[in-house]
């Protein structure tokens, strides 16, 4: 004989558990923090740290794409790796003059190839 009472039915789970709310707040804060770096003209390219002292030392494909440039700075490694990502086969002769210590940096090609693949080989999408 089944004497189950109506109050014994399983209760539906609440969507607003405290841990879920904390997780959603953390995701929201992370996205808001990353969103500060977005510019409608240059996208997220400020995260690459390309300096103006590179000047004419950029590969032509990078010069053709709008990107954020830090003034009075050489930039950081991202400035070189984005140029390698624009030509991951390293066939362009301009890479020799535009990338500092190319043999050393070419050994770390995974991120450059990943950017090239995700960008579909299109310079705008590779840089952004």
Positions of PLM-derived features:
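Start-transfer (signal-anchor) and selected internal transmembrane alpha helices
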Residues: 1-61
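Short hydrophobic/aromatic helix or loop-helix immediately within or flanking a transmembrane segment
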Residues: 75-93, 97-122
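Short, intrinsically disordered, charge-balanced linker/junction segments flanking boundaries
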Residues: 122-128
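Generic anion/oxyanion-binding catalytic loop in active/binding sites
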Residues: 36, 70, 103
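Structural motif marking the loop-to-transmembrane transition
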Residues: 12-20, 102, 106, 110, ...
């Amino acid at each position: 004989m089944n004497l189950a009472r109506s109050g014994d039915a399983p209760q539906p789970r609440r969507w607003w558990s405290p841990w879920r709310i904390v997780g959603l707040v953390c995701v929201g804060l992370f996205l808001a923090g990353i969103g500060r770096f977005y510019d409608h003209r240059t996208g997220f390219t400020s995260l690459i740290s390309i300096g103006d002292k590179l000047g004419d030392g950029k590969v032509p494909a990078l010069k053709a794409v709008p990107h954020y440039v830090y003034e009075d700075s050489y930039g950081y490694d991202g400035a070189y790796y984005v140029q390698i990502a624009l030509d991951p086969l390293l066939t362009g002769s301009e890479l020799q003059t535009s990338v500092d210590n190319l043999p050393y940096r070419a050994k770390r090609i995974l991120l450059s190839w990943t950017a090239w693949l995700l960008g579909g080989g299109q310079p705008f999408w590779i840089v952004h």
